[in-house]
Amino acid sequence: VHLTDGEKNALSTAWGKVNADEVGGEALGRLLVVYPWTQRFFDSFGDLSSATAVMGNPKVKAHGKKVLDSFSNGLKHLDNLKGTFASLSELHCDKLHVDPENFRLLGNVLVVVLAHHLGKEFTPQVQAAFQKVVAGVANALAHKYH
C-alpha cells in the first residue's frame, strides 16, 4: 500500500486513539449482523440469533480483538502486507474456505466503526488513508486464493 507521509501520520494519530477491544468486537459483530451469511464461519460462537445476541457475544468480541490486533500489526508492515498476512491468508483459504469478498466487507465495516468511534477526528483524509489500508489488507488476505 502506497501512502504519503501525511497519510501515514494521519493513520498513526488516529490509530493511537482506537480501543482494540471495543472496535474489533463491534466491527466483527456488525459484519455478522449486516451480512448474516458470514455467520456460517462462526458456528462455535454460540448464540448469533439476533443483533443483540451477536453484539453481546463474548466470543465475537474476543475474535474481533484478534482481528484488530492483526490489522494493527499490518499497519506496522504496510510495505509487506502480503508477507504479513500470508499465514492468515493460507488459513482462511485452505482450511476455513472463507470467501475472499468477506475481507473487503469487513474492511468497509471497520471503516464505518472507526468513523463512529473517532467522530470529528475521522476526517476525509483519515478515511481515505484507512480505505487504502483495508483494501490492501483484504488483497493480502485474498492472496492465497489466486
Curated annotation (Swiss-Prot):
Task: Tell me if Phosphoprotein is a UniProt keyword of this record.
Answer: yes
Query: Which Gene Ontology terms describe the biological processes this protein takes part in?
Result: hydrogen peroxide catabolic process
- Per its UniProt record, what CDD domains does this chain match? Hb-beta-like
Spell out the InterPro entries in the cross-references: Globin, Globin-like_sf, Globin/Proto, Hemoglobin_b, Hemoglobin_oxygen_transport
Q: Write the record's keywords in alphabetical order, separated by commas.
A: Acetylation, Heme, Iron, Metal-binding, Oxygen transport, Phosphoprotein, S-nitrosylation, Transport
Q: In which tissues is it expressed?
A: Red blood cells.
PROSITE patterns tied to this protein? GLOBIN
Q: Which residues carry this modification: N6-acetyllysine?
A: K59, K82, K144
- A single GO molecular function term of this UniProt record: organic acid binding
**Cellular component GO terms held in the UniProt record:** blood microparticle; haptoglobin-hemoglobin complex; hemoglobin complex
- The question of whether Nucleotidyltransferase is a record keyword is answered with no
Q: Which residues carry this modification: S-nitrosocysteine?
A: C93
Give the N-acetylvaline positions (modified residues).
Answer: V1
UniProt domain Globin: residue ranges: 2-146
One Pfam match, given by its short name, reads Globin
| Modified residue annotations for Phosphoserine | S44
Q: Which residues are listed for heme b binding in this entry?
A: H63, H92
Q: What does this protein do?
A: Involved in oxygen transport from the lung to the various peripheral tissues.
Describe the family membership recorded for this protein in Swiss-Prot or TrEMBL.
Belongs to the globin family.
Complex formation: Heterotetramer of two alpha chains and two beta chains.
Q: What is this protein called?
A: Hemoglobin subunit beta
Organism whose genome encodes this protein: Otospermophilus beecheyi (California ground squirrel)
